[in-house]
Amino acid sequence: MRDAMYSADPAREEWKQRVSEFAGSELFDRLFKEGMGLVEEAASYLDGPGRVDSRKLNRELALVFAAESMEVTTRLMQAASWLVVQRAVREKDMKVEEAGDEKYRLARTGEPHPVDRSVMPAQLMSLVDRSRALYERVWRFDTTLYSETPQPAENNVMKQIDRLRQAAEGGAFDPLSVWRR
């Protein structure tokens, strides 16, 4: 019954169509490729040249390097997860309503903490900047597509029945209620 209420709601149908169109668009394809490419690039750097770069740093800067690399990895994994969910919508492996679930939403990121970029490896700082930019774009898509998920239309018949029930419980239909008070 609940599915019938959702499917009859034009606003909800329009929302589902908009999400499906985005998931099937060239824009999404480019975003997906960019996101997955950045994930691969970050993994390659952090598992290879990044290890060498971090060993060249003093202890304090090595900790900053580790923190920044964890943030890059976290941002990219969250963005990649969101992109994979959208691809599942496109491939019809997941319903739009399921993709709209809160567990798939992205959180707004806080302000970045200050880092002396002049002493950190340029490749790491490039990954930091690009992962932030990608996450911000994906977050905006997430917010635009899912933040105002239409609710099922109000059922006016049920609303009227509820009003009648409340009135009856309050004695509105009892002709003798005037003398009982």
Kindly label every feature range from the protein language model:
Residues 2-181:
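Surface-exposed peri-terminal alpha-helical interaction modules
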